[in-house]
């Protein structure tokens, strides 16, 4: 783990030196576009980004070369977002959860039980009236969100204690993403929130620094968490999107013609990633069950939901601009009230 971090630091240092020296090109006059994310090369996110790279290289290959860096090679998600702010890298995929430190508007999508179903979630996230006030809120910070990616439903998983009710979380140290909303959620559920970067979770589980975590099913297999955690409980507390963030200065530097191609490419990331997602979840669950010995539990979600609902009022009262967006999401929840997950 230490070696991997040193490699990431050295690579980031090299990128920054290259930027300062004006060496952002490929040596043949083309502009290198660097994209960082924290998943492996088989993950739907990486497949979507590779499709984007192929698309841009095909359409604008005489001007740009797209390079995709998986598995936190350019640093943690937070570090990569900061590098995207400065332009050291151009595009990063990051969870909405960590974005609260850049704009409070992002806290809305971190609320537990914000969406009543996957169908309502997808419909709301595809509506610019819902997403634009949030995705464009970081323009002054140096970047905007150009599209969203499906990260499924987040659920609790633990090393050796099944979670069937909120009371089962009492006394357990649970890794959460690094956001105030997630910490507050765990406090309301009775667990002990332990914020940490995704790349540190496996070691923390293995060494029993934490008792469990919360994420979608792919974390069990793609990241090996199912080798350590043997109980996965479908409490379905969050549907938090991953975001494709792009440096604003880079976008502003594009000609209208090139920007149109990039916008089409951003839509392609979303299309490919979401098309791959459902099959990847099904495959991960089968692998976790049959090869890793993970037990899947289906608790009543109502007690979990009841425990965290005060968080909705807290976030909305602290940022009244979010209320109209929240109301639009509730309208989608009502529209898809009969939908299944």
Where are these regions (language model features)?
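Short, solvent-exposed secondary-structure boundary motifs
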Residues: 1, 133-138
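Bacterial N-terminal signal peptides that target proteins for export
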Residues: 1-10
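Generic detector of short alpha-helix boundary/capping microenvironments
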Residues: 10-11, 130
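Core hydrophobic alpha-helical transmembrane segments of single-pass membrane proteins
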Residues: 13-17
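C-terminal motif of bacterial Sec signal peptides marking the signal peptidase cleavage site
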Residues: 18-22
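N-terminal secretory/targeting leader peptides
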Residues: 24-119, 138-341
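A gly/proline- and charged-residue-enriched helix-loop-helix capping module
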Residues: 118-135
């Amino acid at each position: 783990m230490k070696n991997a971090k040193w490699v990431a630091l050295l690579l980031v240092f090299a990128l920054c030196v290259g930027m300062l020296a004006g060496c952002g090109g490929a040596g043949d006059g083309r502009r290198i576009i660097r994209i960082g994310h924290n998943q492996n090369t088989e993950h739907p996110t990486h497949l979507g980004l590779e499709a984007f790279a192929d698309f841009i290289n095909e359409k604008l290959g005489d001007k740009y070369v797209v390079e995709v860096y998986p598995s936190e090679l350019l640093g943690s998600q937070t570090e990569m977002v900061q590098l995207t702010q400065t332009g050291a890298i151009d595009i990063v995929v990051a969870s909405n959860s960590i974005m609260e430190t850049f704009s409070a508007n992002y806290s809305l999508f971190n609320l537990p039980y914000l969406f009543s179903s996957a169908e309502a979630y997808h419909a709301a996230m595809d509506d610019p009236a819902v997403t634009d006030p949030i995705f464009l809120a970081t323009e002054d910070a140096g970047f905007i969100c150009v599209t969203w990616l499906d990260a499924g439903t987040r659920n609790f998983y633990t090393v050796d204690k099944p979670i069937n009710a909120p009371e089962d979380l009492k006394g357990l140290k649970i890794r959460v993403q690094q956001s105030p909303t997630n910490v507050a959620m765990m406090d309301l559920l009775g667990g002990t929130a332990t914020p940490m970067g995704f790349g540190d979770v496996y070691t923390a589980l293995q060494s029993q620094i934490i008792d469990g975590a919360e994420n979608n099913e792919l974390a069990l297999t793609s990241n090996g968490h199912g080798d350590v955690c043997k109980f996965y409980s479908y409490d379905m507390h969050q549907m938090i999107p991953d975001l494709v963030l792009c440096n604003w200065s880079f976008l502003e530097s594009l000609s209208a013609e090139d920007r149109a191609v990039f916008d089409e490419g951003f839509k392609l990331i979303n299309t490919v990633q979401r098309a791959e997602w459902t099959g990847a979840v099904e495959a991960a669950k089968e692998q976790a069950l049959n090869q890793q010995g993970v037990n899947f539990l289906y608790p009543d979600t109502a007690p979990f939901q009841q425990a965290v609902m005060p968080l909705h009022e807290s976030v909305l009262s602290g940022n009244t601009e979010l209320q109209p967006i929240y109301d639009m999401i509730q309208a989608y929840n009502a529209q898809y009230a009969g939908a299944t997950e």
